[in-house]
Amino acid sequence: MASELSSAPVLSTPDDHILEVPAADSIPTSTLSDDALRTTYEIVRTADEIRAGGWKRIGLQFPDFMLVDAPRVVEALSKEINTHDQEEAKPERRIYVLADSSYSACCVDEIAAEHVSADVVVHYGRTCLSPTSHLPAIYVYTTHDLDYEVTINEIKKEFSDKTVKLVIMADLTYQNHVDKVVSLLKEQGYNDAVSTEVTRDPAALIPNRKILSDETHDDEHWKAYSIIHISDPPSALLLALYTRFASLHVLSTPSPALENPTMRTAGLLRRRFAKVLALASAGVIGILVNTLSVANYLSSINTLRERIARADKKSYTIVVGKLNPAKLANFAEIEGWVVVGCWESGLIEDDAGYWRPVITPFELEVALMSEEERVWGGEWWGGIEKLGLNDKPEDASKESEGAVAEEEVEFEDVAGGVEGEESAPPEFDMRTGKLISSSRPMRLPVRKNPSTTAETEANSDGQPTSTQQNDSLIKRSVGELASINGVASPGAEFLRSGRTWQGLGTDFDNEASTLVEEGRSGVARGYEVGESGRH
């Protein structure tokens, strides 16, 4: 018998292990004064544009760090709009704050706006200024303060030679300071300093910027200039500026400090070129739709499909929402990805965890070139702005016909008994030197039904014979791709030969079947097993 307890059992942690609940993070509050709020968020201009457009349902899109000001912005904007509407006896307008716009926040979130049937979107903060596909947009960049004295001293410290040629640009949130900085530089003797202004042209020499100059110059003229960017630019802009100017300097904010990111950017560009070489040997390419709001994204997808098909590669179009390595790793048959998005979000910055390389449409064009043609002169573009969507259809058809003619010549049988695919020149991975046999899967032969060109046989009732009804089930020869409806499908081939689990029931294929036998019967005090008696 167990001994009796002399005291109550300890059912709690010791006194010195007091449960400590971490204090909740304090909820941030808006620190702007009423006047500063109206100025920063341009309440008056926004209200005027809304009234001029006649929009009744307005969606406000904030970046995450500005959401703390959202309630006050809604209140101030409603008050400004309703003051004039009441005087004119107009119905009240409704304002909505769009939620879940963190991913690709530089683009106007038309999907979130459609959830509230918004007529217009007011986009706050920095933006890529990509044209929208459906809804009109009002852009409010907001503004930040800049210490002019420290800024000029940093530039003078870096550029002691006052004859240097400088282009001054800034992030949209600091754009209002550019003209003042250039004016102060010219007072210091930097007469070759020029400013920039905002323009909605992602395909410009500086995306969405125009260089202000008394004379008209081509892009080659500006390659002799050094460019200074006020505030930290995104990686896509960093790469673009690095490849188009003599030198690149970044004035970090809010404490102005001039940095030279040349070494870091050069390393990033080399890594981009390595990914291009990886895609050059890929046979199956995934077209990753990263936006549904940018204009021309559908035509861009069609253009990419055509160019991938011309290279005898297979493409699959996939939409997964917010990107992460786990989502893309589910598509094991995809050997590389190309992102369809704006010029900023088209570049996946933190891509170390991705199983397959992810590149931009411009990089894909370089990857699809033949080894004889592939020359990268250092130019770089981030989005779909350089896809050549306005190419004439006849040019594309001629190019396609040329590719077919080239393919026919390439596949001619050669002496020595080598036929068909075996007569094609070998392709190698430029990184590893290994022979690649699957870089152009759409060239591989597909089993075709020989009876399709023969006359139809019929039985006495005039119906097709069973042989013709089942002629689609034909065993593939070695080296042939699986096909769906007569079209080669690397995805189906991977499902057949590459995936270890292909769906419910497929894991029973290798199990040997057994006869049904009589099992144990009876109750707990005695069982009977077949004819062996009671146990």
UniProtKB/Swiss-Prot annotation:
Cofactor note: Binds 1 [4Fe-4S] cluster per subunit. The cluster facilitates the reduction of the catalytic iron-sulfur cluster in the DPH1 subunit.
Pfam families membership: Diphthamide_syn
Comp. bias intervals (Polar residues): 449-471
Subunit structure: Component of the 2-(3-amino-3-carboxypropyl)histidine synthase complex composed of DPH1, DPH2, DPH3 and a NADH-dependent reductase, predominantly CBR1.
Family stated for the protein in its record: Belongs to the DPH1/DPH2 family. DPH2 subfamily.
Localization per Swiss-Prot or TrEMBL: Cytoplasm
Role this protein plays: Required for the first step of diphthamide biosynthesis, a post-translational modification of histidine which occurs in elongation factor 2. DPH1 and DPH2 transfer a 3-amino-3-carboxypropyl (ACP) group from S-adenosyl-L-methionine (SAM) to a histidine residue, the reaction is assisted by a reduction system comprising DPH3 and a NADH-dependent reductase, predominantly CBR1. Facilitates the reduction of the catalytic iron-sulfur cluster found in the DPH1 subunit.
Main location (coarse class): cytoplasm
Gene (name only): DPH2
Statement: the UniProt record of this protein carries the keyword Isomerase: no
Biased composition (Acidic residues): 404-424
One Gene Ontology term from the biological process aspect of the record: protein histidyl modification to diphthamide
Residues that bind [4Fe-4S] cluster: C107, C128, C342
Keywords: Cytoplasm, Iron, Iron-sulfur, Metal-binding
This protein's pathway: Protein modification; peptidyl-diphthamide biosynthesis
Keyword field contains Iron-sulfur: yes
GO cellular component terms, semicolon-separated: 2-(3-amino-3-carboxypropyl)histidine synthase complex; cytoplasm
Native source organism of the sequence: Gibberella zeae (strain ATCC MYA-4620 / CBS 123657 / FGSC 9075 / NRRL 31084 / PH-1) (Wheat head blight fungus)
Record protein name field: 2-(3-amino-3-carboxypropyl)histidine synthase subunit 2
Ranges in coiled-coil conformation: none
Cofactor(s) annotated in UniProt: [4Fe-4S] cluster
Region (Disordered): 390-471, 512-535
Record-linked InterPro entries: DHP2, DPH1/DPH2, DPH1/DPH2_1, DPH1/DPH2_3
GO molecular function: 2-(3-amino-3-carboxypropyl)histidine synthase activity; 4 iron, 4 sulfur cluster binding; metal ion binding
Basic and acidic residues composition bias: residue spans: 390-401
